[in-house]
């Protein structure tokens, strides 16, 4: 178990963008919902992590990123010792309309760690750089700076190549975590449908909202 803390390290991760929605909670209600979600989600996520990935550090720390002017965002990262960190910006805590929403986002971020997405994403970046950098050489890009530029592009494409898959994996496992902690994942997943739908852009990093909803519905129906 853990207590919400404060983190001030910047992260270069995609932000969730808010949309206008009714029934915004008071600050007091939002903070209370966050604390309840931490108390119930963290033990479930830790237990599942230890069952599925016994070699991983499963001691989740859930923190508040209170730096000013932050967007609505939540992210999962690792501290220097490999401890999994789940961070919420203050605007995200305020944006969630109920306990199910804040809990589902928390479960989704915990799922990224349990599924090993950081390591897998890094591996994809390396593979993408090698493939596209190699192709540039084969196809006649003999200038070294051109090949280096192609390699950088390849790393970016490789890092994104499974990001949609990772998000759907996190939605699926997050659904199980949220439900096991006593929350309604279908109600919680509504948070994602107040943000712009990315559709099916080639280099988009998040799946279409319809795909995400179908994933949550499918997993929830089997619980």
Name these PLM-found stretches.
Residues 31, 35-42, 89-90, 99, ...:
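Extracytoplasmic/secreted envelope proteins and their assembly/folding machinery
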Residues 9, 118-148, 189-192:
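Post-HEXXH active-site segment of zinc metalloproteases
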Residues 16, 45, 120-125, 151-154, ...:
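Charged, low-complexity, helix-prone segments enriched in Lys/Glu/Asp/Gln
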Residues 3-126, 180-181, 201-203:
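Peri-catalytic and regulatory segments of divalent metal-dependent proteins
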Residues 88, 157, 198:
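Residue-level signal for pocket-adjacent positions within structured domains
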Residues 140-187:
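Metalloprotease/metallohydrolase-associated module, dominated by Zn2+-dependent proteases
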Residues 163, 181-223:
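Long, well-structured alpha-helical subdomains associated
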